[in-house]
UniProtKB/Swiss-Prot annotation:
GO molecular function, one term: tRNA binding
UniProt xrefs under PROSITE patterns: RIBOSOMAL_S12
GO cellular component: small ribosomal subunit
Protein name as it appears in the record: Small ribosomal subunit protein uS12
Stretches for region Disordered: 1-42, 105-124
Gene: rpsL
């Protein structure tokens, strides 16, 4: 417990909040170029081949971003839009690629939750 005199001299320090997506530098999304597109395996107890991409952002940062949805058209040098949001079972993956923006196509045959996967409304 500090004395009154110590508080006058130093004051209370407020704990600063750290960002969950520091590479975006406060932006909601950022554009980037895929440097590598590959699959990786999740932590135990899950098992799959998760699609991820290494992306160099316009601010110079390089991040690993998850490619959501079934199937994708990304390859090296594709221009993508990156948003924050981690993938719990992939260590080090703190970003998502936005489907349906820039070079990333939306998910084909998607019927529900289309807005999250960049899919247009199906016309009957």
């Amino acid at each position: 417990m500090p004395t009154t005199q110590q508080l006058i001299r130093k004051g209370r320090k407020t704990e600063e909040e750290t960002s969950d997506a520091p590479a975006l530098e406060g932006s909601p999304q950022r554009r980037g170029v895929c440097t590598r597109v590959y699959t990786t395996t999740p932590k135990k107890p899950n098992s799959a081949l998760r699609k991820v991409a290494r992306v160099r952002l316009t601010n110079g940062n390089e991040v690993t971003a998850y490619i959501p949805g079934e199937g994708h058209n990304l390859q090296e040098h594709s221009i993508v839009l990156v948003r924050g949001g981690r993938v719990k079972d992939l260590p080090g993956v703190k970003y998502h690629i936005v489907r349906g923006a820039l070079d990333t196509a939306g998910v084909e045959e998607r019927r529900q939750g289309r807005s999250k996967y960049g899919t247009k409304k199906p016309r009957e």
